[in-house]
Regions:
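Membrane-proximal intracellular helices of multi-pass ion channels
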Residues: 1-294
Length: 294
């Protein structure tokens, strides 16, 4: 359905590049599967309607089709059968069917809250740059794409290379990517941890972490180590490469290196041209892609 809608003339600019149905099918699959691969840039092929459809496809992929169907069922006051609950439990990576409905609504609340907050931060840069309407829309598009780790943007054909040294865009998008890649189970654990710490105020910080799941511990510790190690390695490998970050100051070099480390594991955005990166750096990026997210 998504590919058919994107292939219709009403979804295209009047002067958009000539495309076939297979091009739109490829883009649709890439959006729903949140891979970030595209045979035609979103900004050149699709108008406002096409880009809204693209956002919906990415959001569907990020949340998962099973959870969307279940959410719709619960919203319509209907009940899920046992087989449907088993499917939803598996889709949400839950060990139990207890409180599936409440857990699902938490997932949606977390998703839309993080996307909205990050979009507001991005708007502080995009509204002065693109104007009110386009600034808000472009911010929402980028926020949805980044949180869902989809890797698409509607800003041009160079990904985020024009914003390589822009701290607002880099940090906001990196935060969204990390938030989406951690997984909802980790986020729910983090929220419960913060509530427990605020409410009980344990004298020893370690006491607040005791109910934290082993999965959350593993994901957070490994993510921190990979980000720190990956950033330093990418910086050391590229710091003298004038085609990538060699002409930037140290803080800008670290910012670019950090962003590549974040996006390589799951998202697919880019603030440098990887064809200009050193072979050893691209090898590092390949290893990060193999490792992936939480």
């Amino acid at each position: 359905v998504g590919s058919i809608l994107l292939s219709l003339p009403i979804s295209h600019y009047a002067n958009s590049p000539e495309t076939s149905y297979l091009d739109h099918l490829f883009n649709t699959v890439s959006m729903v599967c949140v891979t970030g691969l595209s045979v035609v840039p979103v900004s050149k092929a699709y108008n406002g309607l096409g880009q809204i459809l693209s956002m919906l496809l990415m959001q569907t992929g990020g949340l998962g089709l099973v959870s969307l169907i279940a959410f719709s069922t619960y919203t319509l006051k209907n009940k899920l059968g046992l087989s449907d609950q088993d499917l939803l439990q598996s889709a949400l990576s839950r060990d139990t069917q207890k409180d599936l409905k409440a857990y699902l609504f938490k997932v949606y609340k977390i998703t839309f809250s993080i996307e909205a907050m990050a979009a507001l931060v991005i708007m502080t840069d995009f509204i002065p740059r693109f104007g009110l309407g386009h600034g808000i829309f472009n911010s929402l598009f980028l926020a949805v794409s980044a949180f869902c780790n989809a890797g698409f943007d509607n800003l041009g054909s160079n990904s985020l290379q024009d914003y390589a040294t822009n701290p607002t865009i880099n940090l906001a998008v990196a935060f969204l990517i990390m938030s989406g890649s951690l997984g909802f189970a980790v986020w729910i654990d983090l929220i419960q941890l913060m509530r427990r710490y605020i409410k009980d105020r344990p004298r020893n910080w370690k006491l607040a972490w005791r109910p934290f799941s082993n999965q959350s511990h593993l994901v957070l510790i490994s993510t921190g180590c990979l980000l720190l190690g990956g950033t330093l390695l990418a910086w050391l490998l590229e710091m003298d490469n004038s085609k990538t970050i060699g002409t930037l100051n140290v803080w800008q070099q670290l910012l670019v290196s950090f962003f590549q480390t974040v996006t390589m594991r799951t998202a697919g955005f880019a603030t440098i041209s990887y064809t200009n990166a050193d072979f050893s750096t691209n090898l590092l990026f390949m290893i990060q892609m193999i490792i992936g997210g939480g």
